[in-house]
Amino acid sequence: MSLNFAAMARQSERQASTVMVPKGEEQPESPKIHTLGSNELRKPAKRISKVNEQVRELAREMLRSMYAAHGIGLAAPQVGVHQQLLVIDLDPEEAANPPLVLINPEIVATSGALDTYEEGCLSIPGVYLNVVRPSQVDVKYRDELGRPQRRKADGLMARCILHEMDHLNGVLFVDRVSDELSLSGELQRLGFDRNDVKPVA
């Protein structure tokens, strides 16, 4: 997910994680983020059977890519790794605020009103369009140490979790955009192919 939510991000709750990489610095070589049109983005992700140092290093590499691209969320399929792993940091400019790592996340329930907000994505840079999503989500997952966790989130955190979890199923936020005119116009403006969008119900 891309940084078009700065005001909302400042109101976000603190996140807990021990996987840290430097923020606000030039990032070392990091995995390439695939963009709309890449088949890598459409492949479903597989569950991670064992949480180990290799998984933690992947999370660090994803964070480096995310920070370098000025994003607030990234899913493993976006860097061509088809495993169920997400990293989120709603306050990427605050060094003391650790990122959130979600391994094998599962939605327990969604609730609250259906809200419409503008979203962006590091895999579709420059495109920002309105998407309707539930305002609250209850998600269970394992953290970077393999411990089971459960989290209830609302606002930007809920939206970011839902956005990134879509990537694990090969779904992009543009697949959920209902304003066809705006969608086609934005994609054309930035050189993306409208035919690469796969609408979901």
From Swiss-Prot:
Region: Disordered, residue numbers: 1-34
Gene giving rise to this polypeptide: def
Disulphide bridges, residue numbers: none
UniProt record similarity statement: Belongs to the polypeptide deformylase family.
Cofactor: how and how many bound: Binds 1 Fe(2+) ion.
Cofactor needs: Fe(2+)
Ranges of compositional bias, category Basic and acidic residues: 23-32
Keywords noted in UniProt: Hydrolase, Iron, Metal-binding, Protein biosynthesis
Active site: 164
GO biological process assignments: co-translational protein modification; translation
Signal peptide: none
Name of this chain's protein: Peptide deformylase
HAMAP family the record matches: Pep_deformylase
Its biological purpose: Removes the formyl group from the N-terminal Met of newly synthesized proteins. Requires at least a dipeptide for an efficient rate of reaction. N-terminal L-methionine is a prerequisite for activity but the enzyme has broad specificity at other positions.
InterPro entries: Peptide_deformylase, Peptide_deformylase_sf
Top EC class for this record: hydrolase
Documented EC number(s): 3.5.1.88
Known catalytic reactions: N-terminal N-formyl-L-methionyl-[peptide] + H2O = N-terminal L-methionyl-[peptide] + formate
